[in-house]
Amino acid sequence: MTPKELMYLEDSLGMEQQLETKCNDYASKIQDESLRTALTNLASQHKQHFNCLMNQLNQ
């Protein structure tokens, strides 16, 4: 993996982690159940993206 590719993956990891955290934070503050569910689902997707990127780094 080139240094540029590694930097891209590291940046993407940070963004996915931040997005997961924000979605979970907003979900905990929202009273509307449908919005809470949507944000929780988004947080799960960002966690999956994070895990996928981590798997690429560990190969």
Predicted regions and their residues:
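His/Met- and acidic-residue-enriched segments that coordinate or traffic transition-metal cofactors
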Residues: 1-59
